[in-house]
């Protein structure tokens, strides 16, 4: 069972060692798994999802892919095929600072997805992007190795794994 973001905020908001950060409420849940979390792998790119496919093709070990897509609203960075690939490879979900597509299909896949919005247009395929770099969006800076927890009430990030 996934930890609830509200419970994590209540338990850890005043603990300096957890470095708990709550994202600004701008992301929308699209995946069939509303509650998800795990260790973060970051990716920074713009309107190009080749690196998203590369990472979701590798074993995820219950992790969360955090994609800083620059907030682009001009194309989608993830759709049903990539979500299914991530699920098959053991990722718990993805946070996309950009758009997704195939929203009806995403809702049927046991994979967490939160993003800014939907867009029907696919992304470019140039293979550009940086992995394991600090990314900042929604009022929070996230690094690979942080822990992310998402549910219907929002997204929180901590410097370490949290328990209740």
UniProtKB/Swiss-Prot annotation:
Catalytic activity reported: 4-hydroxy-4-methyl-2-oxoglutarate = 2 pyruvate; oxaloacetate + H(+) = pyruvate + CO2
GO terms, molecular function: 4-hydroxy-4-methyl-2-oxoglutarate aldolase activity; metal ion binding; oxaloacetate decarboxylase activity; ribonuclease inhibitor activity
Cofactor comment text: Divalent metal cation.
UniProt entry tagged with the keyword Ubl conjugation: no
EC number: 4.1.3.17, 4.1.1.112
Known cofactor(s): a divalent metal cation
Binding site for substrate: 79-82, 101
Pfam families: RraA-like (PF03737)
Keywords associated with the record: Lyase, Metal-binding
Annotated Gene3D superfamilies: Ribonuclease E inhibitor RraA/RraA-like
Record-listed a divalent metal cation binding positions: 102
InterPro entries: RraA (IPR010203), RraA/RraA-like (IPR005493), RraA/RraA-like_sf (IPR036704)
GO biological process assignments: regulation of RNA metabolic process
Main enzyme class: lyase
SUPFAM superfamilies: RraA-like (SSF89562)
Subunit structure: Homotrimer.
The family this protein is said to belong to: Belongs to the class II aldolase/RraA-like family.
Role summary: Catalyzes the aldol cleavage of 4-hydroxy-4-methyl-2-oxoglutarate (HMG) into 2 molecules of pyruvate. Also contains a secondary oxaloacetate (OAA) decarboxylase activity due to the common pyruvate enolate transition state formed following C-C bond cleavage in the retro-aldol and decarboxylation reactions.
Protein name: Putative 4-hydroxy-4-methyl-2-oxoglutarate aldolase
